[in-house]
Structure formats: C-alpha cells, structure tokens
C-alpha cells in the first residue's frame, strides 16, 4: 500500500538475507550514520570498558546495535572486525574510519572474512595500528585467557559464554570433578579450576586443543599436568568413561552446531538428543549437567524437548530439574524484531538421584 517501512539493504551473506538499518526515510549509509550507531554502542559498553577484571567483550553486535553484517570485538585495546556480508564489506573503509574515530583507546585492528568471496581475501589479517603480542593475555572476571588475534577465524575464547563460565566457576566448581566436552581451548575447564574444582577433564577431537588447553591453565598459574586433557572423539570418550564407570559432578556440553569428523557427522538439530542420552550416565548422583547450543535454527522449546527426551532415553527413572537458563550477555545486543539473533541457549540441569 506504499507505506514506508524502513531503509534496508539486501544481499547474499553469511547470516540472513537482508537487514533494516533505519526507520527514517532516505537515511544514507554515511559518516553520520556510522558515527551515531558506534557512539551509542560505545556508551552502552562503558561499564565493561571501565572494568578492571574484564578486558574482552563484544563492542558492536551487528543488527543488535543498528547495522547487521559486521561485528567488532574488544581484546584489551585491540579490535577484531568480523565481516559477514560482502555487501557490507564494500563499506569497509567508511566503517573502519568511523569505528577508529569513535572507539577510544584502540591499539590495533584485525579483521575476519566470514563470507564467501571470489577475491580470495584472507580469512584473517592485521589491518593497522600496533600488532598484538602472541599470545595476547586478556581478563574475563579476573581469569586470564591466552588469545591470538591472527590465527584463522577464532581467537581462543568464545566471548558469548562469559556469564556461563562465571556461573560455573561460582556455583558448580568448588570441590567438584568437572568434565568439559567439545572443550576447544579449555576455557570452561580453566574457569572450573579457578573456582576450586578438584579435577577437570577436557575432551576435544582437534589436535590443537592439547597445547591450547595447557596454555590456558599455565597462564593462570595452574600446572596442566594436574588436569586431564584428552585429544579424542567425544563420543569415543563417552564409551571409554562408561567402561571405566567414571562419574563427574559437573558435566559441560557445548558442541558446534555442525561438525564432521572421519567417523561421524554431528548436527545439533538432529543429534543433540542422542548426545544428551550418551552423556547423562556420566553425571554423578546429584550432579549438574550444563547443556549449551549456539544453533539459531533450534528454538528454546525445541532445545528443551531434545534435552528431556535424551535424559529419559538414557535413564528414564532419574529425577532432574532445570534450575537455570542462560543466554547472550548484554554486550551481545539482540533486536526484538530478529529473535534468531538470540542464538545462545544454555540449560543448567540438576539431578536428584
């Protein structure tokens, strides 16, 4: 009916098909636009920027802060700009110029290319300023993490799990044995150890996970040899643990949305319930199961159904309750109009027998 709805751009990209960037008719993507949204994002993170015990977080969260297709992460003064849209990348110079003009204290800039492109752009590169040391040690709630600004798309820590790590440290670590599956660089394990866990066990199929996990313990003054680290398929570890009758007080499960190894293909949408069924027997009586997914195509209600079905399939008579649900922290701003952007779902489940 020819009613104006908003200004948007449409294009092929890693996430989504199109984004509305303004409700103002004829608003241009210019210096004033980007300066405005960056200033608002910066002000909304003032508390984090002033924090002495947290020096890494999401500084600009794409559509949640007014413009989809690009995110900016803060690592103790170094910023990592991730591009999800080739169309948005055409505004690269304008966006970087306004970001550097707005965000105070930037030491160096890195970028990640997360869209398919025909120009063969490197997936990770240093853009300018001062290069970060390797590793760059950042703080999260007082815990140190070794990060790498220019080692592929990942840096060594998933910033969206900050509140989950802190919850595990504060409530589910002291005096407990902790199993961390799909452990990546062992960040959950380090948080648990710093929270007083008597033993942590980290399991990941990637060869790099061993040295990376050892490093995360070491930078916090924890001897890696006092912890257990396995480089093996998580599902094979389940079989090993059941055979050895191993039980853990806290079990953390945070698989990728989709993964393929030589032995199997895993998809959260299809296989998470089976995963829960296999890991439930490893949870000690009155233990805690922490289940996480970043699959945007799985709703919270669907996720809960998968979990409940998996537990019942494994041990139908076992009593349990969901005691806590966590999602994205406030720096990962989510627009009300795009619920799929609110992708992180984490359930804390306590067993009573």
Tell me the role of every PLM-derived stretch.
Residues 234-312:
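S-adenosylmethionine
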């Amino acid at each position: 009916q020819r009613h104006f709805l908003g200004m948007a751009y449409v294009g092929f990209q890693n996430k989504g098909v199109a984004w509305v960037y303004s409700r103002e008719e004829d608003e241009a993507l210019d210096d004033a636009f980007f300066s405005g949204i960056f200033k608002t994002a910066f002000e909304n993170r003032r508390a984090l920027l002033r924090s002495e015990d947290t020096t890494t977080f999401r500084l600009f969260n794409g559509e949640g802060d007014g413009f989809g297709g690009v995110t900016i992460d803060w690592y103790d003064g170094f910023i990592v700009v991730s591009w999800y849209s080739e169309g948005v990348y055409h505004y690269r110079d304008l966006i970087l110029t306004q970001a550097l003009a707005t965000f105070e204290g930037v030491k160096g800039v890195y970028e990640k290319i997360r869209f398919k492109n025909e120009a063969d752009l490197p997936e990770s590169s240093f853009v300018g300023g001062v290069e970060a040391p390797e590793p760059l040690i950042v703080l999260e709630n007082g815990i140190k993490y070794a990060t790498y600004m220019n080692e592929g798309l990942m840096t060594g820590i998933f910033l969206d799990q900050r509140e989950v790590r802190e919850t595990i440290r504060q409530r589910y670590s002291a005096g407990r044995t902790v199993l961390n599956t799909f452990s990546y660089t062992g960040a959950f394990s380090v948080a648990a150890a710093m929270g007083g866990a008597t033993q942590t066990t980290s399991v990941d199929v990637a060869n790099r996970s061993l040295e990376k996990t050892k490093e995360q313990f070491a930078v916090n003054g924890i001897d890696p040899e006092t912890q257990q680290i396995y480089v093996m398929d998580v599902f094979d570890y389940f079989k090993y643990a059941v055979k050895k009758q191993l039980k853990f007080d806290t079990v953390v499960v945070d698989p990728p949305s989709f993964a393929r190894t030589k032995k199997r293909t895993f998809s959260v949408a299809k296989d998470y319930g089976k995963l829960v069924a296999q890991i439930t027997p490893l949870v000690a009586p009155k233990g805690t199961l922490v289940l996480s997914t970043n699959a945007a195509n799985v709703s919270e209600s669907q996720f809960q159904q998968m979990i409940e079905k998996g537990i019942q399939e494994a041990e139908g008579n076992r009593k349990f309750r969901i005691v806590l649900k966590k999602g994205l922290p406030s720096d990962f701003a989510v627009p009300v109009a795009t619920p799929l952007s609110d992708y992180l779902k984490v359930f804390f489940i306590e067993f009573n027998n």
